[in-house]
Amino acid sequence: FIPYLEHSIELGRSFIQPRYQGKRSLDYLWYGIGAYLYQHPEIRYLIGPISLSTSWPEPAQKVIASFYTTLFGNHKTLVDPRLPFDFELIQEFAPFKQVADEENYKQAYAILKALMDDFGVKVPILYKQYVELCQPGGCEFLGFNIDPSFSNCVDALILVHINTIKEKKHQRYIESHATVFQKRDSA
């Protein structure tokens, strides 16, 4: 895991006030991250936790963990959670295994969404956004942990390979800063 850390930045938790949620707030966060990445091309990975609220029913948390482990799990065991979240892989996702393409992901996601509807919750937006930011294989879920210092929520630790960010998103969030920094540097 150390070789990854040498070329990584950690993305900590973000909180957006409810009155600003849904109004491009996550988009603005991505622009900020992209500006930093533009200035630091030596960074190759984003690493950080994504939390599941403790207000969620535990069975829904287990389905989320199963889905993201089945389709996006890193099977090299780069990390060992201190307090592992206990869950089993569920059969609904078994046919999909590692995501091979967008269509495969869409089919699996439709199943996940239906299961979440049964629990009365929605798939957390950051889980969806990180996965959809990258080409298949570019976002890896390294493990699920219970975080006692954060209300015992369930955290997924993710590893994003920056070189797999989809072209449109790379242009929007990272390359869009080229003119800003060129103007600043020439002033």
Pin down the residues of each PLM region.
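Short, solvent-exposed polar/charged micro-motifs at secondary-structure junctions
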Residues: 57-59, 150-156
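Acyl-donor binding region in acyl/amide transferases
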Residues: 1-138
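Non-catalytic substrate-recognition and accessory regions of acyl/acetyltransferase enzymes
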Residues: 1-9, 154-187
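Short proline/glycine-enriched turn/loop segments at secondary-structure junctions
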Residues: 143-150
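Metal-dependent phosphoester-hydrolase catalytic domains
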Residues: 137-143, 157
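Active-site proximal loops enriched in glycine and acidic residues that flank catalytic Cys/His/Asp
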Residues: 50, 145, 160-162
